[in-house]
Each structure stands twice: as C-alpha cells, then as structure tokens.
Design a protein with these regions (language model features):
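Short, cysteine-centered beta-strand-loop-beta hairpins and adjacent loop/turn segments enriched
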Residues: 63, 90-98
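A solvent-exposed, acidic/Ser-Thr-rich amphipathic alpha-helical stretch
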Residues: 24-73, 77
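Short, acidic, Ser/Thr-enriched surface-loop or helix-capping motifs
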Residues: 28, 93, 108
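Short beta-strand edge/turn micro-motifs at domain boundaries
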Residues: 101-120
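Short acidic-aromatic low-complexity motifs
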Residues: 1-32
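A short hydrophobic beta-strand element
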Residues: 77-88
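Short beta-strand segments enriched in hydrophobic/aromatic residues
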Residues: 27, 88-90, 104, 120
C-alpha cells in the first residue's frame, strides 16, 4: 500500500475506534513508538516492536478510569509520513477528568507503519 492508502485505512478504522485492528493490519512487526520526553513522568515510555507497543497501550488503558469521548482528524500526507490530530476526554485513575490533545506522526515504509511519534 502507498502512504495515502495506509493513511486512508488508518482513518477509516480510527473513526470507529478500531485501534487494535489498526495495529494488526497496518503496523510492521518491528515498528517503534516514540513519546515526548515529558511523558515519562506520566508513566509513558518509548517502545520497540509490536509486543512492546501493545503492552504500552494496555498499560495506558489500565490508567484510564473512564473514557468520555475522543477524536481523530483526517490524515495529512507528506512523502512517507502522515499525521493526525487526536484527543480524548477521559478520567485517569487518581488524577481526575482531563482533555488530552496531541499530534501523531506516522512513517510508512513498504506499505506498513514503521514509526509512530506523539507530540503533546
């Protein structure tokens, strides 16, 4: 798939909250996930490989007490990259309710996402 095709499929699945399917279908086995440096204070770290990325997602989900809503914008494509705006309204365990917004940038090689990087 081209970057545009990967981005379109990502968007279709994201609009219905199918994050597991996105990872299963669109990610390379050796993909990496990069968080901003300040995310470590929130218990979020970088991950390499799909097993580690899935565990990172599970750990984040365990921190969520209640999800009130969320969004993912349409992708913007540039070369082998696409980016989306994302956000969620959630109550984190022991931290109360908050609105989180970020930009996510994805790198595509040989029809698969090989890197995700988050900015917030």
């Amino acid at each position: 798939m081209t970057t545009q095709e990967v981005a379109n499929r990502f968007n279709d699945l994201a609009q219905t909250g199918q994050w597991d399917t996105i990872q299963k279908e669109l990610y390379a086995d050796n993909a990496v996930s990069i968080e901003p440096a300040h995310a470590a204070a929130m218990g979020m770290s970088n991950a390499e490989g799909m097993d580690a990325i899935r565990k990172k997602g599970e750990a984040f989900n365990q921190m969520v007490e209640e999800m009130h809503g969320g969004y993912c914008t349409a992708p913007v494509i540039g070369g082998n990259f696409f980016s989306v705006g994302m956000g969620m309204d959630c109550t984190m365990k022991g931290m109360g309710r908050s609105q989180m917004d970020e930009i996510a940038v994805y790198e595509v090689k040989e029809g698969k996402i090989v890197k995700e990087q988050f900015f917030f």
